Amino acid sequence: MPKRKDIQKIMVIGSGPIVIGQAAEFDYAGTQACLSLKEEGYSVVLVNSNPATIMTDKEIADRVYIEPITLEFVARILRKERPDALLPTLGGQTGLNMAMELSKSGLLEELGVELLGTKLSAIDQAEDRDLFKQLMEELGQPIPESEIVNTVDEALEFAAGIGYPVIVRPAFTLGGTGGGICSNEGELQEIAENGLKISPVTQCLIERSIAGFKEIEYEVMRDGADNALVVCNMENFDPVGIHTGDSIVFAPSQTISDYEYQMLRDASLKIIRALKIEGGCNVQLALDPNSFKYYVIEVNPRVSRSSALASKATGYPIAKLAAKIAVGLTLDEIINPVTGSTYAMFEPALDYVVAKIPRFPFDKFEHGERRLGTQMKATGEVMAIGRNIEESLLKACRSLEVGVDHNELPALSQVSDDELMRKIVKVQDDRLFYISEAIRRGYSPDEIAELTKIDVFFLDKLLHIYEIEQELASHIGDSYVLKKAKQNGFADTKIATLWDMTAQQVRRIRQDQKIMPVYKMVDTCAAEFESATPYFYSTYGFENESVKSSKESVLVLGSGPIRIGQGVEFDYATVHSVKAIQAAGYEAIIMNSNPETVSTDFSVSDKLYFEPLTFEDVMNVIDLEQPKGVIVQFGGQTAINLAEPLSKAGVKILGTQVADLDRAEDRDLFEQALKELDIPQPPGQTATNEEEAIEAARKIGFPVLVRPSYVLGGRAMEIVENEADLRSYMRTAVKASPDHPVLVDSYIVGDECEVDAISDGRQVLIPGIMEHIERAGVHSGDSMAAYPPQTLSQKVKDTIADYTKRLALGLNCIGMMNIQFVIKDEQVYVIEVNPRASRTVPFLSKVTDIPMAQVATRLILGETLAELDYEDGLHPESFMVHIKAPVFSFSKLAKVDSLLGPEMKSTGEVMGSDRTLEKALYKAFEASYLHLPNFGNVVFTIADDSKEEALQLAQRFANIGYGIWATKGTASYFENHGLHVRLVEKIGSDDDKDIPAYIRKGKIQAIINTVGTKRTADKHGQIIRSSAIEHGVPLFTALDTADAMLKVLESRSFTTEAI
């Protein structure tokens, strides 16, 4: 079937902010889809609330709306744009749920908008647990015994009948939210209650647990003419029972026989055909390791995290083709863009092994619950390609950026055998390292397989890695063993440790012995046809397939896996940098390890190397490509940390030089620079041990802000009020030493703002100043920010512009820099300078219409601002108000406190724009799912130091008709000041009348909870905060955010005053 001519305009719904379970893979899918539809000549309208994405760039669609993905706003856009059709299957769960809502509201029918791709009935059949069960029974496909329940009692009754353990799966939720494995009645009671609340249709599936089966996934495609094929099949290293997003995954499957492969393939194709899915679909199956018995676990009728992985693992662009199928093209009409010669109807064949390892946020959340189950917890993932399992697994381990270069955590050698076994059985995010340690201690693969239900085949590979370690240790300098270790993915640094030499020495031995990697092409067809993709991975074998081009090239380092503090914003900057390199006439080469992102789409750059971002792996590419230089400004801290070792090895770093990067990051050098430039900063000192820290704090005066130097996203930062707290911080939070000093600064309570600037060494362009809504003390990544600034005087703005220019020129900055200021009594202080692109680049680029990363890249390559037609100084402000608001994933992370402070906790962001501050704030709150009704009850539980300020907020809430509830101390303060309050217990002896109980009953619409500076003592507050999050009740832990919400509520309510 040729493409449809009866539709011209298509609306695509994006997936909104990044949360755990729905990350950058949808930016990649949405970007591909929009471009794919434009390529076919359709007009595309895009709606997405997340500014940090490539897909919300003007050139991706014909009309781009950065608006909340809620019925209210999407309906307005539909009425305004009147598209012929809507494509919802590329926006993750958000897009699907929105399509469902629009359809149920009758709006699609009223406007005559057709749904493209998979039909709603099919989405319903796959997502609604009851309909799915019926369909599987009709097809004769086995599913675990299960029961659909709408009440907790029904759940308990069913479980009593089939026996524990059982799995709870709420309907229509994302990333296993609200689900879990229950091994007894108490656990089921709690999880089922929560799951029913979270499910938008109050429905859960309770099923017999098949934990311990092998988990196999098939990524399948089907078109409107019923052609269907398997793009990729993948096998989880971890058995069923751990969410696939949290599992280590290999592609293609490693341990199943051809018969099993065909059996599961047939089942997957049968299911996608029965559901009549048009586009991509992911089928998860459980296979009994001891027989040919299997079960269908679930089907995702949309592009998913697994399809991003499958696309990158095979080179087959699923989202791009899904969009073409949606407009009527068939697989036998679409040319496979990888080979450029075969059609898309070919099933990809792989002659390599791909390993994916999830990246977890527990380096940020030390108290988080690390146990893994059916609810996803990873924020991102890495992928590595090799010629064998050992190679791809070890490359993936060193891509994780958790301070390891091998499947080994040095600290585990101290762990007792009992503890080791406990960690292997009760699965945590770092189980791979515990299993590897057990093998080093002589436990056999069979013993471990018995405990973990992981296939012995994989454990044998871990044993093989250990055997090579032994061989290396006993054959120092032996080139045969060295070659074997390299072919199995060992890093130079690991070999160096075993040989007791430096990694440089190992590298030299390799060069002398000609043991160098070759680069192989990812071509979808195991080299059977000619292929046109410049997409490579390294391995130690024969025949190098990557040829250095005659054109001068520039290498851009990506930012690795998505984690808290280093999100998709850096990928955005990387992609823009590549565009600018190409526009300047150079060949652009990207190196990155993240399968979810746009930067690792092989059509973005001239060459893509899918490799770990380590010194060794980067140097190997540089040796081959001999680029003009390397750009490290856009890859976050990952890339910046490589600047010094690369520069020492004689590599040219383009843009700001290493010595100047050091001046911004090293405390003493930075203070020196500020003195020379005559710029004030909060008084501070560095300390290399506990006593020095105490002495510094006495001199400066409490409160102080303490943090280690050289970190991203505010890791291990705290505001400390007294000596006892400071001592405990120095003992527990950081390991201070002369090499790694701790910074002790005076903590100034003032307004915070930040600036991104672009400099060519002579002139400095400041696109705009962003003013934070929360005062200093909340990490900039977790603050709401307004552009243009709403409360700064002209004098302060001029000072900020002046200091920014002095800093950029004084630090010899070429390209980008980000500066954070705090303002108190009209006095401006510099808090910190980051000599690189920051996480605000996408937001500021969108609201000022300056493609900042592109401009910075052109300057890095030697052009000037004047040549690019940009003025020196502060860019004129826009007349619209734009708000950037953070989005958190606390509901996925048990035991992580949602209290905001100097350590970053948000996973994503949204933007709200309008003509007034109140309207922009309203949109930002709606987009970040903080919805407050016009009236209801608000609970105040406030620390002593902010009761006075909270009183004014409470009075404003009362004026618009809210009921004011408060806990004991706060209530008596409010009553003494003439405000009528209902007293409520924090955590009561009668657990039917305390705050968590009222939250459960839906009696509380918002909670405002601040904590004194001694944060640790607040156990009750933590329980209240987590119950608010579990039940989706808006929670404000900073009074400034509550004030912003009040502005919105006040602007929406009429004034009713007696005369």
From Swiss-Prot:
Mn(2+) 1 binds at Q284, E298. This is Carbamoyl phosphate synthase large chain. Mn(2+) 4 binds at E832, N834. It catalyses: hydrogencarbonate + L-glutamine + 2 ATP + H2O = carbamoyl phosphate + L-glutamate + 2 ADP + phosphate + 2 H(+). Mg(2+) 1 binds at Q284, E298. Its cofactor is Mg(2+); Mn(2+). Binds 4 Mg(2+) or Mn(2+) ions per subunit. Residues 930-1059 form the MGS-like domain. Mn(2+) 3 binds at Q820, E832.
